Curated annotation (Swiss-Prot):
Top-level lineage group: Bacteria
Function as written in the Swiss-Prot or TrEMBL entry: Involved in the TonB-dependent energy-dependent transport of various receptor-bound substrates. Protects ExbD from proteolytic degradation and functionally stabilizes TonB.
Pfam families given in the database record: MotA_ExbB
Protein name: Putative biopolymer transport protein ExbB-like 3
Cellular localisation: Cell inner membrane
A cellular component annotation (GO) from this entry: plasma membrane
Organism annotation: Synechocystis sp. (strain ATCC 27184 / PCC 6803 / Kazusa)
Gene Ontology biological process terms from the UniProt entry: protein import
Amino acid sequence: MAGGIVAVPLLGFSLLAVALIIERAYFWSQIQLRQNRLVNDVLKLYRSNPPGAIAKLKQNADLPMARIFLEALCLEGATPTEFRLALESATQAELPLLKRFNTLFQTIITVSPLLGLLGTILGLMRSFSSMSLGSTTAANASGVTGGISEALVSTVMGLVVAIATLLFANVFRSLYLRQFALIQEQTGQIELVYRRFHDQPEEKEYATSR
């Protein structure tokens, strides 16, 4: 193999990175396409039809924001304080899912260049071991060039895997930060609606009876 023995783990890292990138890309695409529209619909619907809003959330329970809202809205007779605590605890429970695979991404980004460097050293060692003082035979020259080629290929492979993974990891991190800010905003909105709803029991009875 052109990159030497370190090409094997680097190839494994590249395949793993591709699989993780595809999973995260699908996850975030679903959130971007569906979640904001769902939250807006639920906020409007809850003012007039709370059971209908809860039913709509249950239909989209695969989305993090739907699970967060359900955790609080399904509490019977919750005070505004209890409602807020339920939102906060549900938000904390969803954060690991939003940050999923971050550790693996960082491992690939960190280890891949080191493996490339290791391949460089092994390739140079092979080149030096093939050199014989005063010898200019074809076999000797082939061993030297083969070792240098191994050193260069392993370095390039390590850098390519690390750089490509870093770019996607940064994109996913920016999506996570944006989503976290939206969660703070949207949980605040549903809490405000619930407080108004809780403070007007006659409106609540009317909406529930509809």
